[in-house]
């Protein structure tokens, strides 16, 4: 059985929150539903944990965006769909982001897509190349800390792997990068302003989940370990 799921087959409470909160927001946007700013901002807490690291730059915490991706055997097909969409970008085309949302639903957040998701890992891209980057190059131990006011909080411990290198734009072929580095950057660009040439400057983070704790201020939290 998938370690992210309980004995009933349901996602455990961390993944149910982290994956489905983001997915529900994407679906709502794709359907044109209005979301209050407060609800929108709260939904981002499942996407923007604090990355905790410790190394030559000292004990550090940095807020970064995260995401889930399909398992290895589905990546090439999904990447091809992403790239086809990205290459269709036209500054005058106001439908680009809406079409991107539909792609994200197809490959990440549909009922069928959920069966293909890699819940063993959490992914991100590096854009700053300061404290976190230096620390993870020296020491892969990492904790991701999530907090949604007023009381929900999860602590996820594991190991961080840096996929790819930080190249100057124009010095490397984006399509020669490691598959995961291409995919994470493409997944970002499916909705946001795309720039394929920029991918070479943004290595990916692959965080292997080892332990999950519910630190929420409620009767099932306060450091309770979630089976995984």
Regions found by a protein language model. Give the residues of each.
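Binding-site signature for planar aromatic cofactors or substrates
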Residues: 1-228
């Amino acid at each position: 059985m998938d370690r992210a799921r309980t004995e009933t087959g349901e996602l455990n409470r961390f993944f149910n929150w982290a994956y489905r909160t983001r997915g529900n927001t994407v679906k709502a946007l794709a359907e044109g539903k209005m979301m209050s700013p407060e609800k929108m901002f709260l939904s981002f807490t499942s996407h923007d944990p604090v990355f905790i690291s410790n190394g030559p730059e000292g004990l550090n915490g940095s807020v970064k965006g995260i995401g889930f991706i399909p398992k290895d055997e589905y990546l090439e097909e999904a990447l091809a769909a992403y790239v086809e969409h990205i290459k269709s970008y036209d500054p005058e085309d106001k439908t680009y982001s809406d079409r991107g949302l539909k792609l994200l639903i197809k490959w990440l957040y549909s009922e069928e897509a959920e069966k293909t998701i890699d819940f063993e890992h959490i992914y991100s891209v590096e854009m700053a190349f300061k404290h976190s980057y230096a620390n993870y190059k020296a020491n892969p131990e990492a904790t991701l800390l999530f907090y949604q006011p007023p009381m929900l909080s999860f602590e996820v411990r594991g190991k961080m792997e840096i996929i790819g290198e930080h190249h100057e734009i124009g010095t490397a072929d984006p399509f020669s990068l490691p598959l995961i580095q291409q995919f994470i950057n493409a997944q970002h660009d499916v909705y946001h302003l795309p720039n394929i040439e920029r991918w070479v400057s943004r290595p990916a983070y692959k965080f292997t989940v080892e332990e999950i704790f519910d630190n929420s201020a409620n009767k099932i939290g306060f450091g309770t370990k979630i089976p995984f």
